[in-house]
Amino acid sequence: MKSFLLAAALASVSAPAPAVAPEAAWRADIADTNKAYTVTPHAILKIQDAAYLGEGNVASLMGQRGVPGSYKWVQGYQPGAALVAAFSGGKAALKKEDKPLANSLADIEVDKDVDVQAYPTQVQAGVPGIRVFVYNQQNPATKAFKGVDYFPYNPAFIVTADFTPDPNLPPRSFITSRRTSKQFYHAGVAHFILQGKQFDLPFYADTNDPKKITSLSAFFTDDLTGKGAYGAGRYVDAPDLKSFPPKQFKIDFNYAYNPNCARSAFFTCPVAVDHMALAVFVGERDPHLHH
């Protein structure tokens, strides 16, 4: 479940392409990821602040006109705010200069090089709310970014897994990087052999409606976690499912990636709890050790 924000950021740069060799496709995916971190208008590292709002919560965006780096959220209603965001009656409600906006989930320009976007989210497991990001097109974090860092590509870490679905798709709550909780649905278990070892790895969906499940994700740690791989674990996806449940699907650990929280404090990412007793020397490295 590579972050929908990453997917949204890539929307402006990605286009259908002819089939390419697996390693070339992997390198292209890394290039797109780098763009999603720094280049696109809603790049991840352009986020300057975030407000997470549940039912009845209000936040005010305060800042100095003409100074993009000054815009920050303040809890509650503040007179003179550039923008006021609230979540009420299960819906986002945003006001600019005290005037309600017709579409509170649209991109909102606040100042030169500063815009705001609200997204549906969970403020606790299964509890709806919104997260409202402030984007600064001149954010210094984009200049400091050196690109994502991956272990070398190795086709030996591509497996075909048999899948045992969980017919009930029960909810499972994960502790997040912000010490809140976030709910996903246990879709089933993937069974595969990797480096001569048998693994049974749980996969999760973001909906419990089988007709809407088009991809699955595993949140895993391995023997490299904290020793070259990100300490909160990595994610790997089974994308582009034709239907659910599949009998089998491919897992390519070369694409194992860090949650957005590895580089941005403004996200709430589930902390992995499913362990693989193997050093997975592919996928993304820990950015704090290598950059």
Regions found by a protein language model. Give the residues of each.
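Forkhead-associated
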Residues: 52-98
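Sec-dependent signal peptide recognition
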Residues: 1-7
